Amino acid sequence: MKKKYYISISLLMTIIVLVFDQVSKWLITISMKVGDSYEIIPNFLNITSHRNNGAAWGILSGKMLFFYIITIIILIVLVIFYIKEAQFNLFMQVAISLLFAGALGNFIDRVLHGEVVDFIDTNIFGYDFPIFNIADSSLTIGVIFVIIALIKDAIINKKEV
């Protein structure tokens, strides 16, 4: 019988992402100055110490109150979505846990430091992508998983009609 909620898996996923996110950011802040960069994979991956007080690409830079309010709303909405829409669906619960962990990881940075620590610096197919962190990766993967889960549900529901 399928469980309604996989709370232990969801909590474990959230905690693992948060720990990796916060520890990696702490290591960057104690070992690198802002702007320092180390090439890991030539022309593809650098570790670059960067701070961001906005969103991706510096959008809404300095609008901390906005980010505090929006993040709290998003975290509440994610909990409600988890309870109401993710019942019996482990994949959706993992997706929401990734979203929650990513949002919370960057929220912690904003509250404690007034900015987010970014350090993953990639060059993908010649495009110098904005520098990001593990929380951002968790958010991106969570969004992709939610889309996959919604498409899968739509296909299953269409077959049942």
Curated annotation (Swiss-Prot):
Q: Where are the transmembrane segments?
A: 9-29, 63-83, 88-108, 131-151
For this chain's UniProt record, which GO biological process terms are given? proteolysis
The catalytic activity, as recorded, is: Release of signal peptides from bacterial membrane prolipoproteins. Hydrolyzes -Xaa-Yaa-Zaa-|-(S,diacylglyceryl)Cys-, in which Xaa is hydrophobic (preferably Leu), and Yaa (Ala or Ser) and Zaa (Gly or Ala) have small, neutral side chains
Keywords carried by this UniProt record: Aspartyl protease, Cell membrane, Hydrolase, Membrane, Protease, Transmembrane, Transmembrane helix
Enzyme active site: 118, 136
The protein's GO terms of the molecular function aspect are:
aspartic-type endopeptidase activity
According to its record, how does it sit in the membrane?
Multi-pass membrane protein
**What's its EC?**
3.4.23.36
Q: In which pathway does it act?
A: Protein modification; lipoprotein biosynthesis (signal peptide cleavage)
> What GO CC terms are in its UniProt record?
plasma membrane
Please give the family membership noted in the entry: Belongs to the peptidase A8 family.
Physiological role = This protein specifically catalyzes the removal of signal peptides from prolipoproteins.
What's the name of the protein?
A: Lipoprotein signal peptidase
- Specify the species: Staphylococcus epidermidis (strain ATCC 12228 / FDA PCI 1200)
- Please name the taxonomic classification of the source: Bacteria, Bacillati, Bacillota, Bacilli, Bacillales
Q: Gene encoding it?
A: lspA
